[in-house]
């Protein structure tokens, strides 16, 4: 969706941004209006296929051995991207780290949605080549309880009371 790195070392696919109009429309229909029909499901899968191909191009272009998924496999704010990445990782077996900040089951808007089957398939995926990392012990217990997945704990905190040291 977007990057803050050198454009020569970056692969950006506009369809990957969760604020992209079509994705915002999908989210509105599923999570606000609570509606899903065959046309919407087909569109989700069509975008998923395009994104999966983009992920593959990215991996091949940069000859990656690992992929790091930063909070993309925990919250379904971009269903097609999460599905694409989960499916790609499952099919290729590429090693990956899924870094989770928070999960869909922590947000009321995602509970009981008409896309529950899609959410459970990819958020988080249970593929064995994925190393799950969470930022707190509550999330570590919840991912184990809800998804049967072990997760490593790497706290994502900063001390805002003290000034940072020199770089």
Task: Identify the residue ranges that each predicted region occupies.
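Catalytic cores of nucleotide-sugar-dependent glycosyltransferases that transfer UDP/GDP/TDP-activated
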Residues: 1-167
